[in-house]
Amino acid sequence: MTTGFLQKIFGSRNQRLVKQYQKTVATINALETQIEKLTDDQLRGKTDEFRQRVAAGESLDKLLPEAFAVCREASRRVLKMRHFDVQMIGGMVLHYGKIAEMRTGEGKTLVATLPVYLNALAGRGVHVVTVNDYLAQRDAEWMARLYNFLGLSVGINLSGMEHDQKQQAYAADITYGTNNEFGFDYLRDNMVYETDARVQRALNFAVVDEVDSILIDEARTPLIISGQAEDHTELYVRMNALPPLLERQIGEEKADGTGVEKPGDYTLDEKARQVFLTESGHEKAERLLAEWGLIGEGESLYAPQNITLMHHVYAALRAHTLFHKDQHYVVQNGEVVIVDEFTGRLMAGRRWSDGLHQAVEAKEHVKIQSENQTLASITFQNYFRMYAKLAGMTGTADTEAYEFNEIYGLETVVIPTNRPPKRIDKQDQIYKTAKERYDAVIRDIRDCYERGQPVLVGTTSIENSELLSHLLKQAGLPHEVLNAKQHEREAAIVAEAGRPKRITIATNMAGRGTDIVLGGNAEKQAAFIEADDAIPADEKARRIQKLHDEWETLHEEVKAAGGLHIIGTERHESRRIDNQLRGRAGRQGDPGSSRFYLSLDDPLLRIFAGDRVRSIMDRLKMPEGEAIEAGIVTRSIESAQRKVEARNFDIRKQLLEYDDVSNDQRKVIYQQRNELLEAHDITETITAMRHGVITEVVRQFVPEGSIEEQWDVPELEEALRNDWQLDLAIQEMVNESSSITAEEILDAVMTAADEQYEAKVAMVGRESFSAFERSVMLQTVDRLWREHLAALDHLRQGIHLRGYAQKNPKQEYKREAFELFAAMLDAIKQEVTRIVMNVQIQSPEQLEEAAEQIEERGGHLENVEYQHADYADAGAPVANVTAAAAATATADMVGSAMTHSGPGGEMPKVGRNDPCPCGSGKKYKQCHGKLS
C-alpha cells in the first residue's frame, strides 16, 4: 500500500527512467537542424571524428547525443526511416545495458542501429544476436546500407560458413548472427591448436533480439559439441519392448497406504515431466529383463553391473510416456526431429540427450543414431554473461523482469508506444470439452470471415493446428497453416496474413520475426515477385505497382472490419508466449482484438485449475456449448501460469547453480589453453610438472624425512625404469653411502630426469621440442577435459540421491566436482610428463611425426555433432540433468608416438580390471591402461 502511494507521487522506476531519457532525447532533437545541414561526406566524416574522440578517452555516454543524432540522420537519408523519439529512448536503454520491452511493430530492428553504431565506434566489435539465420541475414543486409554509409563494416556469421569467412565476419565492426552460432564458435575457439585458427575476438557488447526467447526459453538447453561414443543400438531396441508391458499407476501412495486408485508399475508426474518405477514395477522389469537374458536370474537392477541398464529402462519409459509424436517431435525422412515447444519450429539436427533420442527412435522404429560423448558444452546463461556489456529487446519481457535481473543483472524498461494501442483483449471463454471449444472457435472464425476481418489462430502444437485445419476444411473455410512442417512457405504466408478474409493457423508465433500488416505486406509480396525469375521485367513492374495501388484500399477495409483478430485455442504455460500471440494484433496504433478459447481438457487447466473450474460449471448446471466468461476464472488461470513460471525459474536457477561449478572449471581450463596457444616456449611449465611428478613418485617409495628401513628402493628403481625411462642404480648409491638421505635420493633422481630431458632437447633443438611439448600438452588437456565432463555428467545424474542421506546435493556436487577437477589437473601433469619422458627420438623429423600422430589420434574425434540438447525435455529431476550421454573417451594418446628401448620399457600384460602394476591402487583400465 505504501509502495503504491509513493509510486503515485514519484512515479515508478520505469517512469522515472523514461523521463530521464526524454531529457537526452530533447538534447538529440536540438542537434537535428545542424546535423541535417551536413553533406553526405561530412556526415560520414563524423564517424572518424567520433573514433578519434573515443581513442582520446572520451566516454561513449558523453558521445551518445551526437552519435544518435548522426545515426538518425543517416537512417533518414539511406533507409528513408527517421527514428521516433520513443525509438531513441529504446536505443538508450540498450546502450546502458538493459532490456527494452517494445511492442510488436515498434521497429526494434531500427532501434538497435543506435546503440550498435555508438558502441562500434570503440573498435572492439558489437554482436547483434538473432534467433535464426534468416533473421540474421535479413537484418544484416537491410542495416548494412546504413552502417556502410557511416563507414562501418558489417559481417554475417552463419552456420556452415568457411573458417576464413567467419574470421572476416568477426573482424568487422558489427557482426550479425544467431545465438547458437556465437556459442558454438566460442566452444570451437577453445578446441583449436593454433592461435590463428580462432575466429572470435574478446566478447565486448551484444544486443540480443527476442531476448526472452534466447536467455529464458533456451536457458535450460546447453550448446554441446559431441563425438560418437560406444554403440548401444541393440540395447535400445530390446528395451523398447519393455514399456508396453508395464501399466501406469493412477494416484500417489500416501503415508497411510491410501491414495492409489489403480495399482501399476510406474507413476507419471506430468507437472514435473518425470516417470518413476513403483516397487512392483521394479520387480516386473527385473523379471522381464532376466527372461530376455539382459540381467542374471534374481539380480537387482541396482546391482553395480546393471546400473547402465537403469539408464536404458528410464529412457525407454520416458520415450513412451512423456514424449508424443506430432507434439514433441515429428518423424521425417526416417528421422525423429524435435519440435520446439516454444515456437513450434522443427529443430533439425538437434537431439535430446541422455539416450532419450535413441529411445524415441527405437519407439518409432527408425534408424537409431549412436550416442554421443560431450567434447565441449556451455549454457546460454554462462555464454552471454561473459560479454562486457549485454542488452536485449523483445515485445514481452516484463513478466520475466525478475529473472532477467536475478540471473543476468539486466533491468527491464518498458518503452512507451509511438501511438496509443487500440487492441481489445476480450475475456477468456472456458468450455467443458475440447469439442465445444473448437465449435466456438469455428463460429468466431466464420463470423470474422463473413465480415472480411483477417484472423490469426494460435495453437500450442502441430497436432492441434492440423486438427483445426481439418475442422476448417469441413466447415468450408479457406485457410493457411503455418507450423514447423510449413517452414519454407512461412514468409509468404505471414506476408498475406493481414489481407481481408484471410485465415491463418499458426503454432506459437514467437520469434517469427515478421509483422502482420493490415491489408497484407505489400513490400514482402513485391520482394517475392522481384525474386521470381520466370516473370518478365515489365510484368514485374506492373504487378508491383498494382500491389501498391490495391494496398491502401485493402488496408482501410481491414481497419473498418476491426483489424487483425487473434484467437488462442489454448493457454501456454508461460504468460509471455500468450502475450506474444496477442501482440501480433494492434501494431503501431492499428485496431485489433484477441480472445482465448479454453477447455477443461487443456493440460494447464487439467493440472492446475481444472477441478475448481469444473466444480463451478457443475454447480451452475451449465448446458453443453455454454462457456464461462469471468474475470475470476481468467485470474485463476494466470495464477496457474505464474506458478509454472516460478517453477521453471527455479529449475533454470538451480541448473545455473550446478552449471556454475563446471563453468568456473571451464574458465580455468580455457584460460590455461589460451596461454598455452600463445606461448612459444613452455619449458618452465614442463619442468615444474616434471619436478612435481618425480617428487611424488620418489616419495611413494622413499618418504620425506624417513630412514633407510622405511625405503623400498628396488620398487622405486623398477617404477623409474618402466614408467619414466630412468635406469638408475639407486641401491648401489645407498650401499655405498651409509649417511645418504631421502632428499639426496630425490635430488639424484631429479638430476637424472633433467639430464635425460636436456639430452632430448639437444638432439632435435629447443624450438622443435617446444612445439612437440605444446602439442602433447594441448592434446592431454583436451582429452582429460572431455573425460572430466563425462565424469561431471555421471556425478550430476546421481547427486540428488544424497538428499536421502540428509546431505545438501548442491554442496556435495560442488565438493566432489572440485575433487574430480583436482584429480584431472594431477592426471594432466602425470600424462604430459610420462609422454615427454618416454618419447624416443633421434631427429626433428621423428619428433614432428610423433606430434602429428598425437594430434590426429587425440584431437579430432570423428562425426562431431553440434547439439542444442534440451535438459528439461528429457524429463530428468532438476538436480539430475545431464549434458549428454557421456561415455569415457579412450583416445590412444601415445601409441605409435612412443618407442621403448629394450624389454624393460614394456608394460606388463594385465587384465583391464586387474590392479594396475604401477601401485596406484586403481584398476589397470583406469590408470596406465588408458595409455597402453
From Swiss-Prot:
GO molecular function: ATP binding; metal ion binding; protein-exporting ATPase activity
Key word Isomerase present: no
Catalytic activity field: ATP + H2O + cellular proteinSide 1 = ADP + phosphate + cellular proteinSide 2
Localization of this protein: Cell inner membrane; Cytoplasm
Subunit details: Monomer and homodimer. Part of the essential Sec protein translocation apparatus which comprises SecA, SecYEG and auxiliary proteins SecDF-YajC and YidC.
HAMAP family according to UniProt: SecA
Primary role: Part of the Sec protein translocase complex. Interacts with the SecYEG preprotein conducting channel. Has a central role in coupling the hydrolysis of ATP to the transfer of proteins into and across the cell membrane, serving both as a receptor for the preprotein-SecB complex and as an ATP-driven molecular motor driving the stepwise translocation of polypeptide chains across the membrane.
Protein's name in the database: Protein translocase subunit SecA
